[in-house]
Amino acid sequence: MNFLLIIFLVILAVIIVVYVFLQQPNFGKRPAGERLEKIKNSPNYKNGVFQNLNDTPAITDGANYFTVIKKFFFGKSNRSKPATALPSQKTNLLNLPPDENVLVWFGHSSYFMQVDGKTFLVDPVFSGSASPLRFTTTSFKGSDVYTTDDFPVIDYLFITHDHWDHLDYDTIRS
C-alpha cells in the first residue's frame, strides 16, 4: 500500500510540474472572442482544427510511423551538427543606407530584408535555442551572432508558423 501511495504521489507531482510548466506565457493561450471567430471563419479550419487545403501527407510513401520513430531514435545521422562553426559575417544593420536593398540570412528560416527603405524580419529566433527547454535544440555556432539590439526599427514582422524554430517568444518580446 505504501509503495502504491508513493507511485501515485510521484505521478501527481509530474502532472502538476508539467501543468505549471505549460502555463508559461511563451506557450501562448487559447484563442477567444474576435480572434476565435476569425479562426473559425478560415477556409483551413474544419472540425475544430486547421487543415491543409491540399493533400499534404505527414509521412512519405513507403514509410510508416513505426519506421520513422525507429529511425529517429535509433538511426545514425552524421548531418546533425556541422563539423566546424558556420562561416558568418555580421552586417551592421543599424547603419544600412535606406536606399540599399539587403538580404541577411541568420540560419534556418530567419532572415532580415531591407527593400526600398522598408525593413522586414522573418521568423526571428535570437535567444540561442529553438525549444522551451533551453538545453535542447541550441543554435549552431556562427548562426547566433545577432541579438535584438542589432536591429533597426522593423516595419514588418512575419511569422510563418508557430513552431519554436520560427517563433521565439523571447526575441519577439525584445
PLM feature spans:
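Active-site metal-binding motif and surrounding structural segment of the metallo-beta-lactamase
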Residues: 135-174
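Metallo-beta-lactamase
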Residues: 2-137
